[in-house]
Amino acid sequence: MTKRILNVAEKPSAAKEIAAILSNKRATVREGFSKYNKLWDFKYNILNFNDCEMTFTSVTGHLMEIDVVEQFKPWASCDPIQLFDAPIRKTVPSDKEPLKKTLEREIKKADILILWLDCDREGENIAFEVLEVCKNAKKKFEFYRAHFSAIIPREIDRACKNLAKPNEKDSIAVDTRMEIDLRIGAAFTRFQTLYLKKFKIISNSDNQPKTTTPANGNILNNSNNNSSGKEIISYGPCQFPTLGFVVERYFRIVNFKPEDFWHLSVVHEKMDTSSGKMIPVTFSWCRNRLFDYTAAFILYEKCLDNTEATVVDVTSKESRYRPVPLTTIELQKAASKKLRISSVQTMQYAEELYTKGLISYPRTETDSFQAGTDLKGLIGNQASNPEWGAYASRLINNNQFVYPKSGKNNDNSHPPIHPTSSATGLSGNLKKIYDFITRRFLACCSEESVFANTTVTIDIQGERFSETGTMVLKLGYLEVYPFDKRNDKLIPTYQKGERFTPKRIDLTKGTTVAPHYITEAELLTAMDNNKIGTDATMATHIQTIQDRFYVKKNESNQFVPSNLGVSLVASYELMGFEFSKPNLRAAIEADVDKISRGQKTKQEVLLSTIEKYKQLYQLANQNINCFDRSFREYYEPADPKGGEFRVLVSQFSRCGKCNGKMQYKSDQNPEAPKRILFCPQCIDTFDLPKNGDISQLVTSMGVPQNCPICQYQVLSVRNPINDKSYTICPKCRNSPPDPIHKKPFHCFQCTFNCNLATGNKQQQQQQQQQQQQTNYNRNNNNNNTNSARPITTRTTRTTTQHRTFTASNNNFNNNNRNSDRNNNNFIF
């Protein structure tokens, strides 16, 4: 019986290339439910079966995504802290439904499933996503995993002969990391986005955020963010440490204080016997520099007393070097530094070269080739290249081939990045990346370059000076690899004990210079050294902080943080957290690695990590005012609820928190304008009554009357129709001092020991009223009509007074309705 086999690759281009290799380019193509993911059908002998009916298709990266369940998706649905424990589910999103339908249809016709996903942890996770979809459609079928490092016939054939089972531990490790990132990212993103709505985190011609000027450039405004004030200010456990490296360098720049220093140098001219020319030699001071001018000048004068120089040492040594094989991180660093191609673009070009079968898998930490790798065969593939073909031929035909050096890293999954086929017709950055990878591979298989380094040390009056000359003795790998510099620096021959009088001795003043902004190569090195992300994700994290407008590249291709990026990092540092430091993320990555190795379970890692971040969230919530301290340096406050407010009085009443003057503002609503008090120093806003004339309350001596509870200046609200007034504390009105009260809260409801607080007096009046009502009822029962009339009159008068001015603490809701009914000219 003929076996039907469904094969699934990670990308359409990979499916097309692998199908072409297995079918010898004789596959027939048909459409799937997704117009981007076609299917190729052909016959092939595999798994000891002849003429199997093979169908090859693909997904496009992850087939499924995780998210919290529907009830927690609206931002107003819960406190962000609940997202640490909210139920989550992994589902196929709507845009991947066509892929799901194709897999379901094809697996029902298949006996075997072969998973051709990329051979890394992420690919393993995608393999299990494909497997889950297929198992939901069909209960029983065999499944295998194909492992390959390049899309070339030799590797694909080897993969077919060595099919294995997918690695579930690697997949679980990815699921764990994804859940951690989802919970932490969602909680802190909502937390900081919702709170920071109080600031205008946008830039326009009328309102440019404040900037700080470092020693050698301007910090970038967040000017590329064309948001409407509703942008998301995201947090990610990887993106924040990445941002932290950029901001840390920035703070080193802005905090840098230049210092003057002085250094000595000796200039001598001597005949070079080999060239017959006079060569100037500048000997540098072995002390390097002094920051004390007097001390430097004394030593300078000492040297001038007797300028004769004596050669005290001449050392010569050879240095040899050639590069180790290429890893993903080294490719990204070199491309950024030498080719000026960003890390994320580099990986896109490398992926394209890989799917074309031109290079090996571009995501690898390995910098050593396994024994038995046919390196000469790979070099032979390049013999026809017009640029380096002659060099490649010499390597294998003239016995110049040298087995590559071994580095220190091996991920046991993929070999170092190397060319797998000769390429012609490439152009632009794609060609640059291919050329670099190929030249690096040829350099690894070449002889070392040899340099002669000669250092001459002289003495003048006890002060030592030295100079080093360098000469290339053998080009070696440099012949094919122009990306390493050749630093020839000739000096004439000196003999130990030789004496001479220098041409001059100089005392030179210099000034220390601030460090430069961090480059992409330096950022990648910092991330790699601190285990932030993986070789497959580092470029993405760097791109993310650019997409979020936290950083931007300047004209020198260096990363400069925006006001937003600096403010976020500074806020969490004020809280005492190390969110921008690598420690927390490195611990997560280490735990995820342990899941892959079977040393920890998913539940163990989730429990410890989520609990740790939940505690940090609670502490952040308690110290949320740190955002105010950082953000008000760069941003103006936003108008509450997105409205446009105009200032009625710029310095109206006193703030009880900072003791400064608050602004009295109103929005533009002509029918019922909303009025607020706003403190520009504390970034606090207080709602005011919509009706009535509002003025500051002062004592008979003209002194502002402050609330004894919160120290905010009390305001008077007057009804212009009946000329009646009441008083409010703006703070207490919006945040009642006693939780049993609801806002708006007024002085006539307050029971504090204050001459404005009449709540106690009204309580007494209410108690008297209740006692009178009791007496009245008792008298009625006794048919005592003569004494009932005055009680009725007094009760009516007391009740009317009560409804007009107060609501008791014990009956707030009902009495407040009475108050509203009698004071219908006000809306509190």
Curated annotation (Swiss-Prot):
Residues 167-617 form the Topo IA-type catalytic domain. Keywords: DNA-binding, Isomerase, Topoisomerase. SMART domains: TOP1Ac (SM00437), TOP1Bc (SM00436), TOPRIM (SM00493). Pfam families: Topoisom_bac, Toprim. The keyword DNA-binding applies. Its EC number is 5.6.2.1. Residues 763-828 are annotated as: Disordered. It catalyses: ATP-independent breakage of single-stranded DNA, followed by passage and rejoining. Residues 4-149 form the Toprim domain. PROSITE patterns: TOPO_IA_1 (PS00396), TOPO_IA_2 (PS52039), TOPRIM (PS50880). It comes from the Eukaryota. The active site is at Y361. GO terms for biological process: DNA recombination; DNA repair; DNA topological change. Gene3D superfamilies: 3.40.50.140, Topoisomerase I, domain 2 (1.10.460.10), Topoisomerase I, domain 3 (2.70.20.10), Topoisomerase I, domain 4 (1.10.290.10). GO terms for cellular component: nucleus; RecQ family helicase-topoisomerase III complex. It is an enzyme of class 5 (isomerase). Releases the supercoiling and torsional tension of DNA introduced during the DNA replication and transcription by transiently cleaving and rejoining one strand of the DNA duplex. Introduces a single-strand break via transesterification at a target site in duplex DNA. The scissile phosphodiester is attacked by the catalytic tyrosine of the enzyme, resulting in the formation of a DNA-(5'-phosphotyrosyl)-enzyme intermediate and the expulsion of a 3'-OH DNA strand. The free DNA strand than undergoes passage around the unbroken strand thus removing DNA supercoils. Belongs to the type IA topoisomerase family. This is DNA topoisomerase 3. It comes from Dictyostelium discoideum (Social amoeba). The gene is top3.
